[in-house]
C-alpha cells in the first residue's frame, strides 16, 4: 500500500458564494486567503493550505479527488504501474501543481470515470484553524501516525469489479469492509489508506449525478456535531439522514445536502484501526441506530 491519505477535493459549484457560506457558517471550515488565477476559492480545516477547492461551473459535481503519496518514489511507482496497465496518466504542469500546493501531481480516471489527482509533497503553511462557527478542531491527524486526510469520500463505481482492482492493485488502497445494504442491488466497498482511519475512500456500485455519493468531515465530540446540526436547521438546509451511528467505522453523524445537492456527512468518534490486527468484514446493515434517510423529492 502506498496511498498515505485522501488529501483534498476539487468541487465545482453553480453558486460558489452559497457553497462557501455553507462551508464556513454551517460546517465551520475556514476560508483561505489564497488568491487563485483561475478564480477558485478554498476551504481549510487544519494546517494544510486547503482541503476543498471550490470552482465555479454550471453543474454541482465533484471534479477530482486528491490522493497523497508519502514520497516521490511511491508516487512515481504508482504512475508507472497505472501506465503499464494501460491507463492514461496525465502529469500536471508546474503552474497547476502550485495551485494545488503540491510538488507534483498527475491525473488519471478510474474504470468508473472518477477523476483522481495523485500527488506528493504537500506544501503546508501551518496557519491555524480559525473557524467562523467556533469549531475547535477537525480530526485530520493521529498523534502517532500523522495525517489522516480530510475525512472520506464515497464515489460511484458502476464498473465495480474493475474499479476495485484498480484501487487495490494499482493505486495502493486496501479493502476495510464490504457492505450489502438492505437496498436492492446495492453494495458499498470501503477502502483504507496507510493511516488509521477506517476508510478514506468507498465505492458505491451505482452511478450518481454529482460524481460523489457523499463526503465526510469529522469533529472531536458530540457537542460539535449537535451544534452543527443546530446550524443546519437554522440555515434551513435539507437533512439527508438524521443522527445515527454506522456499524463499520462507528461514526456518529448526520447527513446534510450542500447547496447544489452534494451530500456531506458530519460526525465524530470514527474508528481508528490497527491494520495489522484487522480482518475485513462483510455486513448487511449499515447502522447500529438512527440515520433515518430522507431523499428530497422522493420522501416528500
Regions found by a protein language model. Name each.
Residues 19-24, 82, 113, 163, ...:
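Conserved active-site tyrosine of GNAT-family acetyltransferases
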Residues 1-4, 8-50, 155-198:
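Core segments of cupin and vicinal oxygen chelate
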Residues 5-14, 57-146, 187-192, 236-300, ...:
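Vicinal oxygen chelate
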Residues 1-17, 62-67, 130-161, 174, ...:
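N-terminal beta-strand motif that seeds the catalytic metal site of vicinal oxygen chelate
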Amino acid at each position: 500500500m502506498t496511498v498515505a491519505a485522501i488529501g483534498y477535493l476539487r468541487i465545482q459549484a453553480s453558486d460558489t458564494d452559497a457553497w462557501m457560506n455553507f462551508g464556513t457558517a454551517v460546517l465551520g471550515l475556514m476560508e483561505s486567503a489564497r488568491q487563485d488565477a483561475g478564480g477558485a476559492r478554498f476551504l481549510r480545516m487544519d494546517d494544510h493550505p486547503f482541503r476543498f477547492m471550490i470552482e465555479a461551473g454550471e453543474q454541482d459535481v465533484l471534479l477530482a479527488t486528491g490522493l497523497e503519496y508519502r514520497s516521490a518514489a511511491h508516487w512515481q511507482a504508482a504512475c508507472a504501474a497505472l501506465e503499464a496497465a494501460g491507463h492514461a496518466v496525465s502529469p500536471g504542469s508546474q503552474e497547476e501543481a502550485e495551485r494545488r500546493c503540491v510538488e507534483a501531481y498527475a491525473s488519471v480516471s478510474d474504470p468508473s470515470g472518477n477523476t483522481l489527482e495523485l500527488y506528493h509533497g504537500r506544501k503546508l503553511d501551518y496557519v491555524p484553524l480559525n473557524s467562523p462557527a467556533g469549531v475547535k478542531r477537525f480530526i485530520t491527524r493521529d498523534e502517532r501516525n500523522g495525517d489522516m486526510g480530510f475525512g472520506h469520500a464515497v464515489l460511484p463505481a458502476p464498473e465495480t469489479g474493475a474499479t476495485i482492482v484498480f484501487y487495490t492493485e494499482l493505486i495502493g488502497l486496501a479493502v476495510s469492509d464490504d457492505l450489502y445494504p438492505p437496498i436492492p442491488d446495492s453494495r458499498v466497498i470501503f477502502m483504507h489508506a496507510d493511516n488509521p482511519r477506517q476508510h478514506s475512500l468507498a465505492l458505491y456500485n451505482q452511478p450518481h449525478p454529482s460524481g460523489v455519493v457523499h463526503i465526510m468531515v469529522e469533529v472531536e465530540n458530540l457537542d460539535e456535531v449537535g451544534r452543527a446540526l443546530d446550524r443546519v436547521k437554522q440555515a434551513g438546509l435539507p437533512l439527508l439522514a438524521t443522527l445515527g451511528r454506522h456499524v463499520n467505522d462507528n461514526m456518529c453523524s448526520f447527513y446534510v445536502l450542500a447547496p447544489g445537492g452534494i451530500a456531506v456527512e458530519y460526525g465524530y468518534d470514527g474508528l481508528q484501526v490497527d491494520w495489522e490486527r484487522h480482518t475485513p468484514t462483510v455486513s448487511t446493515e449499515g447502522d447500529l441506530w438512527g440515520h433515518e434517510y430522507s431523499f428530497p423529492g422522493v420522501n416528500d
